[in-house]
Amino acid sequence: MMDRVDFELGEKKYVCISVRSTNHKPFDVTSAKYILRNGDQEEKAGTCEIKQKSDTETVLSALIQPMIKGATYTLEYTYEIPPEILKYEVRVYVS
């Protein structure tokens, strides 16, 4: 099941995901970006803030402001833990 966040129209706030090591070994997220989509239409894209909480956990934050009331967006994170490139999606609802 996809994570979900709710926005009121006009809100601008951070949406954060936590990336954790599955094998309890240290890792580094070397880059992270996001795309906010309404259907197939890209509304915003940018670079995530990367905050390492510990050797085995990093938080990725995207500051977004969805602009269409009643819309359902997809916020797609793409991040790199060399040699891997991973993706994660969050559903964004605007009321």
Model-based region annotation:
Residues 1-95:
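Contiguous segments within soluble domain cores/interaction surfaces
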